[in-house]
């Protein structure tokens, strides 16, 4: 007795195999291929994933930062960034130099502007002034802050024993020098007396000898 199901023909069995192969191929497709396939069928683009959106936002932010116009900064044809500022006292432009990035040139302009106008200056990065105004911007030539000069530290105190020893050495040296001085004075005085003729004269001695001989003859 037959169950009522008709046996499949070879053609139908081959068709089922082809359908299974197509399903396997579809399952192995990547998400991007599926999205492209669906967009082609529907005619509407499918929104990209969150990662693609974040990457596109970062690229857009970078392009916006590159296109930002900083005060006192302009780009050279060869790619460098030049910074300059107008001196309010001389009504002339002051050249600040060329820099690799626009941000470095903008910081150089901010520094010069702060030196010229103080807190009234219009800056590219005013938040840097609020964070640390004394370290980043004022230069020593234009800063009005008071300069505190610390006096030199006093020498360490000397112990009384060391003072007494030093005083004793000083006294011994002074006594030796005074003794040497007195000896020199005595030697010089004796030599001067000898030169002045205080020694017995040889001629006087000869005269005395002659007188004594004459008296004996008488």
Curated annotation (Swiss-Prot):
List the GO cellular component terms: nucleus
What does the UniProt entry say about where the protein is found?
Answer: Nucleus
One Gene Ontology biological process = ethylene-activated signaling pathway
MF term (GO), any: DNA binding
User: PROSITE patterns, from UniProt?
Assistant: AP2_ERF
Point out the signal peptide segment: none
**Annotated DNA-binding residue span(s):** 69-126
Q: Where is this region: Disordered?
A: 1-20, 41-72, 174-218
Keyword entries, A-Z:
Activator, DNA-binding, Ethylene signaling pathway, Nucleus, Transcription, Transcription regulation
Where the protein is mainly located, per its record?
Answer: nucleus
Q: Does the keyword DNA-binding apply?
A: yes
Where do Low complexity bias regions lie? 44-56, 174-194
A Pfam family (short name) is AP2
Asked whether the keyword Phosphoprotein is assigned, the reply is no
- InterPro entries (alphabetical): AP2/ERF_dom, AP2/ERF_dom_sf, DNA-bd_dom_sf, ERF_plant
Give the record's family classification: Belongs to the AP2/ERF transcription factor family. ERF subfamily.
Q: What does this protein do?
A: Probably acts as a transcriptional activator. Binds to the GCC-box pathogenesis-related promoter element. May be involved in the regulation of gene expression by stress factors and by components of stress signal transduction pathways.
Note the PANTHER family from the entry. Answer: DNA-BINDING DOMAIN, ETHYLENE-RESPONSIVE TRANSCRIPTION FACTOR ERF112
**Protein name, please?**
Ethylene-responsive transcription factor ERF112
User: Which gene holds the coding sequence for this protein?
Assistant: ERF112
């Amino acid at each position: 007795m037959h169950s009522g199901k008709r046996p499949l023909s070879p053609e139908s069995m081959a068709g089922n195999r082809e359908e299974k192969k197509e399903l396997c191929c579809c399952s192995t497709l990547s998400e991007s291929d599926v999205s492209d396939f669906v967009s082609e069928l529907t005619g509407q683009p499918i929104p990209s994933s969150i990662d693609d959106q974040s990457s596109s936002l970062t690229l857009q932010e970078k392009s916006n930062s590159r296109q930002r116009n900083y005060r006192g900064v302009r780009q050279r044809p060869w790619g460098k960034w030049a910074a300059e500022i107008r001196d309010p006292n001389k009504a002339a432009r002051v050249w600040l130099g060329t820099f690799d990035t626009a941000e470095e040139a903008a910081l150089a302009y901010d520094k010069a502007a702060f030196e010229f106008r103080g807190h009234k200056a219009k800056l590219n990065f005013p938040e840097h002034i609020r964070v640390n105004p004394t370290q980043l911007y004022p230069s020593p030539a234009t800063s009005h802050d008071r300069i505190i000069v610390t006096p030199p530290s006093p020498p360490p105190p000397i112990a009384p024993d060391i003072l007494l020893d030093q005083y004793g050495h000083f006294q011994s040296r002074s006594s030796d020098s005074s003794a040497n001085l007195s000896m020199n004075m005595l030697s010089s005085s004796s030599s001067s007396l000898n030169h002045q003729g205080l020694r017995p004269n040889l001629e006087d001695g000869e005269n005395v000898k002659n007188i004594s001989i004459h008296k004996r003859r008488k």
